[in-house]
Amino acid sequence: MQEAANGVPLVQITAPTAGGVSRNRYADFNVPERGAVLNNSYTPTQTQLAGYVQGNPHMNRGTAKVIVNEVTSGRPTALNGFMEVAGRAASVVVANPDGIRVNGGGFINTSRAVLTTGRPQYGSDGSLRTLQVAQGTVRVDGKGLDARGADSLTVLTRAAEINAGIWAKEAGIVTGANDIDYDTGALTVTRGKDGKPEVALDVAAIGGMYANRIYLIGTEKGLGVRTAGTLIAAGDIVLEADGSLHARKDGRISGENVTIKAGEADNEGLIAADKKVSIQAATIVNRGTGKLYGGDIALQGTAVTNRKDEALEKELERAVAALGQAERELDEAYGADITKFTAKEDLAAYNERIETASRAYDTKLQAVKAVTACMDEMPSPVMAARKTLTVNAADKVVNAAGAMLYSGRDMHLRAGNTITNKGAVIESLGAMTLAAPVVENTNGAFSAKRIGGAWTTNPDMIRIDQYDHPERGRIFAKDEFSSLGSGYGAHHHGSAMEQYAPAYDRITQPTAEEIAAGAQPVPEEEVGKKIANYE
């Protein structure tokens, strides 16, 4: 390695093969803050980093199309400055199986920039055929990585850590143990070395990617993507992971279209698209601070959930159940027949039972208020489509605890088993289609210009799930309910009438024993009528 007149490192790259590849091998390959020039010109040429540089005699038969920089030492590469291709633009590949650390790195006059922990494999003509990735991490820190001087940036690595910004025209990261075809990007999943990393791709809160197009692909089984940073594309964002996607509350994923395929999608951040958000995962969870915004939103999985905090909701359910039990015990204490008391001790014991039950009730009530206050302080998750919202779940759709499903036009919710709206809002400014064997609406609101589907065409059932409801857990045919589309919950006819039952008795024929004791038979036309049982 030489130096230009201003001290910038100057690499006189090797002559290209018949396949157009300049293959350069180093014990160590590091780029200092002042940068480095890869000389791809036979004649003296002007550069941004080093001014005029002398010609590279190795280029006497033609320049390289691809410049490969292979590291063999077992030590990671540090890219702390820009790499500039002098002369004709070429693709630049930095390959180090032991890792690459970027802190202020970048590219100038580069066709395609590739950072990889893979080992290059060449064809018989010396062309670069594949990159075999089995280990290593590419990490971006500090001043980040500016690849806007390249047509595209590709990172091929076992795992990636993004702790700073990445800027590119087009940016792609492929993680996992893979053999990747250099020309087409086609990949074959292989077995990695040295055990699995914790996650395939980790984007910290201070990290981010900014490009016209972004694609992130993780192939290693069970490994996912964790992002608390920012992914912004003027065009499409594609994210595919064999494991889970966890977008934390400070995370932002935003593009013209956002497409996600993962084993599990768990969102606490913002996922937004000008046109369409499409998520396909076994379980899709939008919770707490989670926001899904798009022109259209399409979700497909086994279970789709939109709720604040499931653990806190269950805690509230337990607290309410305990309060109900305390209320029943207090009623029992008050319900003792004081006319049967025969001593002062009986009255004293009665008062003590009431006092004990009252204290227990107050304690349980405070517990409910505490959990409720905690939930009230939490933000509510939202899935909102300016146009159409479509949810297809093989098992269930859950919208709970102040969450909201919204569509500016039509909404289609389909579930193999249940659609649950519990203390939440489902609103469509167009037509709403609900298709599921069981639709549960507890302290929730449905609102739509027109509701169709399961409620009007299917012989489906509705389960009552309101806390302390006397019929909670029981399932009834939907035609036993009224106000299904009112937006304020449904009413079960049986429950409503039973509320008045204690005030009336139904006239019945006396039993044989009662007639024998002197009771008079009742005219048949009177049997079944109600009669007030109060004065």
Regions found by a protein language model. Name each.
Residues 135-139, 191, 195-200, 222, ...:
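Binding/recognition "hotspot" determinant
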Residues 1-233, 240:
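Solvent-exposed adhesion/ligand-recognition segments of exported proteins
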